[in-house]
């Protein structure tokens, strides 16, 4: 079985908290090795990946309503740069969006836009720090994504 890898960006700590909880759930419940990296910690340094991963992306927007009156993504562009660098997006099995439902149509909008731009699915979404139910549900979706890849190739890391 291959290591499960997460690449994400967290600014307020909500996404980091959720990634840690998902990682712990997968480790203890499914006995899988998990590795995660907050892209913010790279401080602009570029890295190339060589195996499957899942991304987590919070939504930070300013201006407009995000749909028909425009918007500007703020603070999370480093994840986009990471995905673009050396074609890293080709290894992304999907993205998990987070946001605040108070923002209506903008809830997790950035994750859906990244999915469209890069051609990978939105695996799931959660609000703010996520609930225990979110952790369990999303962990199952992540494991299913990795199992599909493992069925296609014989991976022994």
What are these regions (language model features)?
Residues 1-72, 76-77:
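N-terminal beta1-alpha1-beta2 submodule of the flavodoxin-like/Rossmannoid cofactor-binding fold
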Residues 49-157:
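FMN-binding flavodoxin-like domain, especially the glycine-rich phosphate-binding loop
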């Amino acid at each position: 079985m291959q290591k499960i890898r997460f690449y994400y960006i967290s600014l307020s700590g909500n996404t980091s908290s959720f990634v840690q909880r998902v990682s712990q759930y997968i480790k203890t419940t499914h006995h899988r090795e998990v590795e995660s990296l907050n892209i913010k910690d790279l401080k602009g340094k570029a890295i190339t990946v060589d195996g499957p991963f899942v991304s987590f992306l919070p939504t930070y927007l300013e201006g407009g309503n995000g749909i028909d009156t425009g918007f500007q993504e703020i603070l999370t562009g480093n994840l986009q740069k990471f995905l673009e660098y050396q074609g890293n997006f080709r290894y992304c099995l999907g993205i998990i969006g987070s946001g605040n439902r108070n923002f209506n149509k903008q809830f997790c909008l950035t994750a859906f836009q990244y999915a469209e731009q890069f051609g990978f699915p939105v695996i799931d979404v959660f609000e703010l720090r996520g609930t225990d139910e979110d952790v369990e549900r999303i962990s199952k979706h992540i494991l299913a994504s990795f199992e599909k890849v493992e069925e296609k190739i014989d991976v022994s890391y």
